[in-house]
Design a protein with these regions (language model features):
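Bacterial signal peptide processing site
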Residues: 41-44
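Bacterial N-terminal signal peptides that target proteins for export
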Residues: 9-29
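Secondary-structure end/capping motifs
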Residues: 261-342
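Conserved C-terminal helix/tail region of periplasmic/extracytoplasmic solute-binding proteins
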Residues: 329-362
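Short, solvent-exposed loop/beta-turn-alpha elements that line the ligand-binding surface or hinge
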Residues: 78-85, 233-247, 315-327
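Pocket-lining segment of extracytoplasmic ligand-binding domains
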Residues: 113-114, 196, 203-294
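Short, glycine-/small- and polar/acidic-enriched structural segments
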Residues: 46-191, 207, 224
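C-terminal motif of bacterial Sec signal peptides marking the signal peptidase cleavage site
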Residues: 36-39
């Protein structure tokens, strides 16, 4: 496998988008241990918490997120605290794993397929309590490229922002669909800044990329790049091939310490209620959120904001409900079956634990 790391000095005038930042070195170390750790999460304001757990208080660590910002700025969070009697303490950090490991967070958000890496790094037993958004990366090529799938790109330059994260999911899918290995010789892997991948593609410095659409708005809008597989994300293809009707694998789920969950069922239920409200607000005020918080979608110009509104309306990766049932958990776990079967992860990597609460009251 040839891996090239590209460093660019090109300025990008917008912040990282909704849940697509690259994790810090701590998370990268966990990924190296398990070949399973990913990109990022979403979050909030406030200083990093050093407080200990206490009843009635939910310590939630997240990275910047438009739905949370909207709920905070419109008073929904304050009203929820008054109505429930619970309080939520938030910590703004890209090192969710670090706070979690130190015992300073009860709930964080990460990809479902990151959870084994989280447990390995933090040495804490966890449980997935809610779902948030699907893994949304796409395979993109230049608009004038004749390739119809990655099978047509053997030996060419594939840009990725990490060799873990969504690359793991695509590695399993490509092995299943084309009997090819993404990270073992079938492509020249170019590791580059996540925000510059689609620009590198448009300029001809790479031949394809595993890209996020919300970080590719300008190139998608001007028609210089196009997605393969009919524009389907990794989650779309996974569901189509392995779990019909499923909405994952998840780019972000809500993960909590199992000992905390076992002792705080009321807090867990109230937290999920708050996020169900957030998901409902997203469905009703999606365009407004994109306008109010364009930095979370990596857009800045009116043209790119308008494009992102239209794109998300057609390809919304946010789930309709935060709670899930046993069948959903089983379908979500099947990504690990596929990864093990295709040799992307080792056979000793265990599935994460899930807490199905759809229709269940505390």
């Amino acid at each position: 496998m040839n891996i090239v790391i590209t460093v660019t000095n090109k300025e990008v005038p917008v912040a990282l988008s909704l849940r697509t930042c690259v994790r810090t070195a701590a998370a990268t170390a966990a990924a190296a241990m398990l070949a399973l750790t990913t990109a990022c999460s979403a979050g909030l304001g406030g200083p990093a918490s050093s407080r200990t757990a206490q009843d009635g208080v939910i310590r939630f660590t997240f990275a910047p997120d438009p739905i949370w910002d909207y709920m905070h700025d419109t008073g929904i969070v304050d009203q929820w605290q008054r109505d429930t009697g619970y309080s939520i303490e938030t910590s703004a950090t890209w090192d969710e794993f670090g706070l979690f490991a130190g015992g300073h967070a009860d709930i964080i958000s990460t990809a479902s397929f990151e959870v084994p890496g989280l447990e390995e790094q933090t040495q804490r037993e966890t449980v997935i309590i809610g779902r948030y958004n699907a893994e949304r990366s796409r395979i993109m090529v230049r608009a004038d490229d004749t390739a119809q799938s990655l099978a047509d790109l053997r030996g060419r330059r594939l840009g990725v922002f990490t060799t873990v994260s969504g690359t793991l999911v695509w590695s399993a899918l490509v092995a299943q669909m084309h009997d090819m290995k993404v990270l073992d010789g079938d492509f020249d892997i170019v590791v580059a800044d996540i925000q510059n991948l689609s620009n590198l593609l448009a300029r001809g410095e790479i031949d394809a990329c595993i890209c996020y659409p919300d970080l590719s708005a300008r190139e998608l809008r001007d028609g210089s790049v196009r997605p393969l597989y009919d524009g389907k994300s990794s989650a779309d293809l996974f569901a189509e091939l392995n779990a019909p009707g499923h909405d994952g694998p998840m780019g972000n789920v809500f993960v909590a310490r199992k000992d905390w969950v076992d002792g705080h069922p009321g807090e867990v239920s109230a937290f999920l209620d708050l996020w169900d409200r957030g998901l409902a607000e997203w469905q009703e005020h999606r365009d407004e959120m994109i306008e109010r918080y364009p930095q979370h979608f990596a857009v800045a110009t009116p043209e790119d904001i308008a494009f992102m509104k239209a794109y998300v309306a057609e390809h919304d990766w946010v789930t309709d409900e935060v709670r899930f049932d046993e069948q959903w958990a089983e379908d979500e776990s099947s990504i690990f079956d596929l990864m093990r079967t295709t040799g992307v992860i080792s056979d000793d990597i265990t599935d994460p634990q899930f807490l199905p609460t759809e229709g269940v009251q505390p």
